[in-house]
Amino acid sequence: MQRGKFITIDGVEGSGKSTQIDFICDYLVTKKINVILTREPGGTELGEKIRTLLLSTDIQSIHGDTELLLLFAARNEHIRTKIIPSLEKGDWVLSDRFTDASYAYQGGGRGLSIERITQLEKWVLQDFTPDVTLLLDVSVALGMSRVESRGRKDRIELETNDFFKRVRNSYIERSKQFPKRIKLIDASKTLEQTAQQIKIILQVL
């Protein structure tokens, strides 16, 4: 049986991931491809509990290193018990965020050591990597205006604009570092125009 493809989709808050995830799933279904939709943090019973902890506004402060370790603990469980088994069955897996988010949010946003993140990545992922990463890019101003329209914010969404500017810059640097895997998509365009950019990438997978 042919191994499935692993697609990740990432970007700052308000980049439109949820809408484009729906488009990707619908597109793959038309191609008779079985797709497993998952997310980080989350995707497993343990991961979802960690997600609740990390996003809860009831917790006033979490040390950056603690946050990073919890994310990689959830990621390890996610990879071992859901992503790899699904790929080995021939399913395609689409994950809302993956390791690039740790470099952007914890590395760029929080200012944690990139070397430390890389060490955790090598330990947890080993040689495992997505087939393609769709990086939806919007300005922080546009992204946060979309977040404001959704109503109540989680712990991460309550961060400052400067935090999200650092996150965005880190994402862009990652796309320059890994241009073959990370496809930078202008998500400030209409939903249809953004989806068309994604469709072109999916057609050559």
Curated annotation (Swiss-Prot):
Chain sites annotated for binding ATP: G11, V12, E13, G14, S15, G16, K17, S18
GO terms under biological process: dTDP biosynthetic process; dTTP biosynthetic process; dUDP biosynthetic process
Keywords in alphabetical order: ATP-binding, Kinase, Nucleotide biosynthesis, Nucleotide-binding, Transferase
A GO CC term assigned to this protein in UniProt: cytosol
Catalytic activity: dTMP + ATP = dTDP + ADP
EC number: 2.7.4.9
Enzyme class, first EC level, given as a word: transferase
Function: Phosphorylation of dTMP to form dTDP in both de novo and salvage pathways of dTTP synthesis.
Assigned protein family: Belongs to the thymidylate kinase family.
Protein name: Thymidylate kinase
Species of the source: Ruthia magnifica subsp. Calyptogena magnifica
